[in-house]
């Protein structure tokens, strides 16, 4: 096999131990200047979780830094190996806890691919609707905390106000505000309530003008532009070399969104645009995510119209070896009772083999690789966590920048530490 060198630059990322060595062997240079090593976090509000940064400073300028992760390690991937495929869905919520349905989706999509299991059209449409509500929910948390980090406190309260509507919708549907565990292999856990669609429609009508309010407060704000424009620039070549995805990649001018390039769940049938930036700075990352919320509203409205036309269609597969039968059947069908008993005591058994699925989560490309040995429990499950990969770009972006800009840089990457450490 011939290995061809790629055209993208090799970027060196320092480790925390390398920066610690600087502190131990810190001697003044020929000009008498001496760097300082600072430990930022893990108990720091602007690291957006339990993230520690080992930072070498020369005055107020960042010489180099290294993320030190693992403080929130939960061993989710290993724990999944000890549970049946269905019982593990609840664990995926705990990774990116701001986008639990995206985690559910990529996990069940990998299993469905492994089993070659079809999903009813109505279930796919409802998945799209819920994934876009999840995207808006996640972006609202990002927008509010990002603005708060740069002292724009009002935006935080406005964003949290709208997020409450989405959490109420999730609670109406699943009984939980954050850890929803609603997706299942072959479809969804149960059908939507009668007032679900009208409630979502009311929210979308209410929400779209609020996005204009956020932009009125920030987009042309002189202080906001001074803190974000031209700061933390990543060009397209570096973004690809670093493995960035999501808005972090698109802000650098790379038009890559899995909903368009590798569509799933019927996304190829929806009309929407993919926001793409040019400068690759904090400001463009902000503009891309804000515009994504508008596009999510557009997709959600299309999904709602389709759901209205699919009334009465199934929300989960009728393959009783994968999905349990309705409870009404159990009372008169011995076969249904047996399927129900076997599914909840043993679980289904995918064939031996492996499968990889990827979707576009609010933070970028989240992937799931499932390996089956033919038993009811997976032999191995690995998640490609976009937060983990996007975070490795921080040393490259922050090098030479002011310490005051580091807080804005972290927020612009939008990491979730539950997903980083998992």
From Swiss-Prot:
Topology of this chain in the membrane: Peripheral membrane protein
Keyword Translocase: yes
Gene3D superfamilies, per database record: Cytochrome-c3 Hydrogenase, chain B (1.10.645.10)
Record keywords, A-Z: Cell membrane, Membrane, NAD, Quinone, Translocase, Transport, Ubiquinone
Domain of life (superkingdom): Bacteria
CC per GO annotation: plasma membrane
Catalytic activity: a quinone + NADH + 5 H(+)(in) = a quinol + NAD(+) + 4 H(+)(out)
MF term (GO), any: NAD binding
InterPro entries: NADH_Q_OxRdtase_suD (IPR001135), NADH_UbQ_OxRdtase_49kDa_CS (IPR014029), NDH1_su_D/H (IPR022885), NiFe-Hase_large (IPR029014)
Subcellular localization: Cell membrane
EC number: 7.1.1.-
Transport is among the record's keywords: yes
Enzyme class, broadest EC rank: translocase
Protein family (similarity comment): Belongs to the complex I 49 kDa subunit family.
PANTHER family associated with the record: NADH DEHYDROGENASE [UBIQUINONE] IRON-SULFUR PROTEIN 2, MITOCHONDRIAL (PTHR11993:SF10), NADH-UBIQUINONE OXIDOREDUCTASE 49 KDA SUBUNIT (PTHR11993)
HAMAP family in UniProt: NDH1_NuoD (MF_01358)
Function: NDH-1 shuttles electrons from NADH, via FMN and iron-sulfur (Fe-S) centers, to quinones in the respiratory chain. The immediate electron acceptor for the enzyme in this species is believed to be ubiquinone. Couples the redox reaction to proton translocation (for every two electrons transferred, four hydrogen ions are translocated across the cytoplasmic membrane), and thus conserves the redox energy in a proton gradient.
Subunit structure: NDH-1 is composed of 14 different subunits. Subunits NuoB, C, D, E, F, and G constitute the peripheral sector of the complex.
Alphabetical list of NCBIfam families matching this protein: NuoD, PRK06075.1
Protein name as catalogued: NADH-quinone oxidoreductase subunit D 1
Protein source organism: Herpetosiphon aurantiacus (strain ATCC 23779 / DSM 785 / 114-95)
Gene: nuoD1
């Amino acid at each position: 096999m011939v290995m061809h060198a790629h055209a993208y630059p090799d970027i060196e990322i320092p480790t925390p131990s390398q920066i610690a060595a600087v502190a131990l062997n810190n001697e003044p240079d020929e000009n008498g200047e001496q760097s300082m090593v600072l430990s930022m976090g893990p108990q720091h509000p602007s690291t957006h979780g339990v993230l520690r940064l080992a930072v070498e400073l020369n005055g107020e300028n960042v010489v180099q830094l290294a993320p030190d992760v693992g403080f929130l390690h939960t061993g989710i991937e290993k724990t999944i190996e000890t549970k049946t495929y269905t019982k593990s869905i609840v664990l995926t919520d705990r990774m990116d806890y701001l986008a639990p349905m995206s985690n559910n989706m990529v996990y069940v999509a990998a299993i469905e691919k492994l089993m070659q299991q079809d999903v009813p059209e109505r279930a796919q449409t409802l998945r799209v609707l819920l994934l876009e509500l999840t995207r808006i929910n996640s972006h609202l948390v990002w927008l509010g905390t990002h603005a708060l980090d740069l002292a724009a406190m009002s935006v935080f309260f406005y964003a949290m106000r709208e997020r409450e509507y989405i959490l109420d919708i999730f609670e109406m549907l699943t009984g939980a505000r954050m850890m929803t565990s609603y997706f299942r292999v072959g479809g969804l856990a149960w059908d939507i309530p009668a007032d679900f669609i009208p409630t979502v429609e009311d929210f979308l009508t209410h929400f779209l003008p609020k996005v204009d309010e956020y932009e009125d407060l920030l987009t042309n704000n002189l202080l906001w532009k001074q803190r974000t424009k031209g700061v933390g620039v990543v060009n397209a070549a570096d973004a690809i070399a670093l493995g960035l995805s999501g808005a972090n990649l698109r802000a650098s001018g790379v038009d890559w969104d899995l909903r368009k390039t590798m569509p799933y769940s019927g996304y190829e049938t929806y009309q929407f645009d993919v926001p793409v930036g040019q400068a690759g700075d904090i400001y463009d990352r902000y503009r891309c995510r804000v515009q994504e919320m508008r596009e999510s509203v557009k997709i959600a409205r299309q999904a709602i119209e389709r759901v209205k036309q699919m009334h009465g269609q199934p929300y989960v597969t009728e393959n009783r070896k994968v999905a349990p039968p309705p409870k009404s059947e159990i009372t008169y069908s011995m076969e249904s009772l047996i399927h129900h008993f076997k599914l909840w005591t043993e679980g289904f058994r995918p064939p031996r083999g492996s499968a990889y699925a990827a979707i576009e989560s609010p933070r970028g490309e989240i992937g799931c690789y499932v390996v089956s040995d033919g038993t009811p429990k997976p032999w191995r499950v690995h998640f490609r966590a976009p937060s983990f990969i996007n975070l490795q770009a921080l040393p490259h972006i922050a090098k030479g920048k002011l310490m005051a800009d580091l807080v804005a840089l972290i927020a612009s990457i939008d990491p979730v530490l539950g997903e980083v450490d998992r």
